UniProtKB/Swiss-Prot annotation:
One of its GO terms (biological process) is nucleoside metabolic process. Its EC number is 1.4.4.2. Gene3D superfamilies: Aspartate Aminotransferase, domain 1 (3.90.1150.10), Type I PLP-dependent aspartate aminotransferase-like (Major domain) (3.40.640.10). It comes from Methylocella silvestris (strain DSM 15510 / CIP 108128 / LMG 27833 / NCIMB 13906 / BL2). The lineage of its organism: Bacteria, Pseudomonadati, Pseudomonadota, Alphaproteobacteria, Hyphomicrobiales. This is Probable glycine dehydrogenase (decarboxylating) subunit 1. HAMAP family: GcvPA. Belongs to the GcvP family. N-terminal subunit subfamily. The keyword Oxidoreductase applies.
Length: 446
């Protein structure tokens, strides 16, 4: 795209067309006190080499996840990604985050989305999955809005074990759409406690498994309670690898399953871009947000792929749309699909088993440290410790010893009495030496 600067005559003509005579008049709605009346205090320009040196120095102040034993999770997980994944997604046919506006021309892209949908539906044990959402939190929010549409009710009950950032997104959108989101305290996540909050105004109950503390949940009793009251059960996950080992939410009676797919095929990426997964039952298909890619045959009987449903506001009338999502996380869901395809069903199961075994081994080491308590009865690759003292200080001491050792619960739930809780994750990247070093360092601090 060419850069076409404006001259003074161009500016005058544009200002006259909109009925003002100066730039100052154009911005008259901005109070004088809020305007910058001087030039920006910027340093002199730098050469490309100087700029690279400056930015490299700034980046060197970070501690990369790959440079130290890494046990941080809490919604974003570090896993090994085969080099072939990054290589393949950089092919020119794929290297875009956007779905084409003439999608049927791009059969390769549509087939990749179709395969992604098939994989997500299989992983979650649901009937149908969409072409992806922005991330797990927005997928959760969209699931709540979908439940409101399906049930014609306006109240969502959010488990205390739901990741607090996900709950924040749901509460924000609920406030803007005149809906009600009841967030329970972080210690309220038992099925009977959640069921007690369901009433005739409840459209859905949102529960996470593994939850934000790492606990695995049996959703079956809650699914029965939701069905009895005419509400939907929304199951959330932040660690997609867990689906290779634990019972999928669909098999436990969930009506909508949403979550974060980052841990398959995608790096930590400083918190994004990520890929939201969204799956549901066939009977709710037309209330599902985003796009749905389908398989068909053309006039000559050849297999082909099309966008079967696109009930978003860019395609249909805004008041009829199920969502205002603008695009799907195309490149991220492609990476997800490629990684999962390379693993296969047996490979994913083995990866999940290694994750679980590593976490069990680490928890066993911690259980032998005086003053440290593992709080979880069942977990996948993440669990919560009670430590003797503020967890934030212990995490800082661990970092000084070269170990990135978890997330203080107080960082996720500020204001709650959780200062002595620390959430720890362990995946296939953690060696026996890493786990031994972590346990030794924690023993020295605790």
């Amino acid at each position: 795209m060419r850069y076409l600067p404006l001259n003074s005559e161009d500016r005058s003509e544009m200002l006259a067309r909109i009925g003002v005579d100066s730039i100052d008049a154009l911005f008259s709605s901005i109070p004088e006190a809020s305007r910058l009346s001087r030039d920006l205090d910027l340093p002199l320009r730098r050469s490309e080499m100087e700029t690279q040196r400056l930015l490299s120095g700034m980046a060197a102040r970070n501690t990369p996840a790959s440079s130290a034993p890494f046990f941080i999770g809490a919604g974003a997980y570090k896993h090994h990604i085969p080099a072939s994944v990054d290589h393949l997604i950089q092919r020119s046919e794929f290297l875009t985050s956007y779905t084409p506006y003439q999608p049927e021309i791009s059969q390769g892209t549509l087939q990749a989305i179709f395969e992604f949908q098939t994989q997500v539906a299989a992983l979650t044990a649901m009937d149908v999955a969409n072409a992806s959402m922005y991330d797990g939190s927005t997928a959760t929010m969209e699931a709540v809005l979908m439940a409101h549409r399906v049930t014609k009710r306006r109240k969502a009950v959010l488990s205390g074990g739901l990741h607090p950032h996900y709950a924040d997104v749901v509460r924000t959108v609920s406030k803007m759409t005149d809906n009600d989101a009841l967030s329970l305290p972080p210690d309220v996540f038992a099925a009977e406690d959640l069921a007690a909050e369901i009433d005739e105004e409840t459209s859905c109950v949102v529960v996470q498994t593994p939850d934000a503390f790492g606990n695995l949940r049996d959703l079956s009793p809650l699914a029965a309670a939701c069905k009895e009251h005419g509400a939907l059960l929304i199951a959330v996950f932040t660690e997609a690898v867990s689906l290779g080992l634990v019972k999928p939410p669909g098999a436990m009676g969930a009506d909508i399953v949403v979550g974060e797919g980052q841990s398959i095929g995608n790096g930590l990426n400083f918190g994004g871009p990520y890929v939201g997964l969204f799956a549901t039952r066939q009977k709710y298909l037309r209330q599902m947000p985003g796009r749905l890619c389908g398989e068909t045959v053309d006039a000559d009987g050849r297999r082909g792929f099309v966008l079967t449903l696109s009930t978003r506001e860019q395609h249909i009338k805004r008041d009829k749309a199920t969502s205002s999502i603008c695009t799907n996380a195309g490149l991220c869901c492609l990476a997800f699909t490629m990684h999962l395809t390379l693993l296969g069903e047996a490979g994913l199961r083995q990866l999940a088993r290694v994750n679980h075994a590593n976490a069990v081994d680490l928890a066993g080491r911690f259980a032998q440290i005086y003053g440290v308590e593992v709080l979880n009865r069942s977990f996948f690759n993440e669990f919560t410790l009670r430590v003797p003292g503020p967890a934030a200080e212990i995490v800082e001491h661990l970092a000084q010893k070269g170990i990135l050792g978890g997330v203080p619960a107080s960082r996720l739930w500020p204001g709650e009495d959780l200062d002595d809780l620390m959430i720890v994750a362990s995946s296939e990247i953690n060696t026996d030496e890493d786990r031994a070093a972590f346990a030794s360092a924690l023993r020295g601090i605790a």
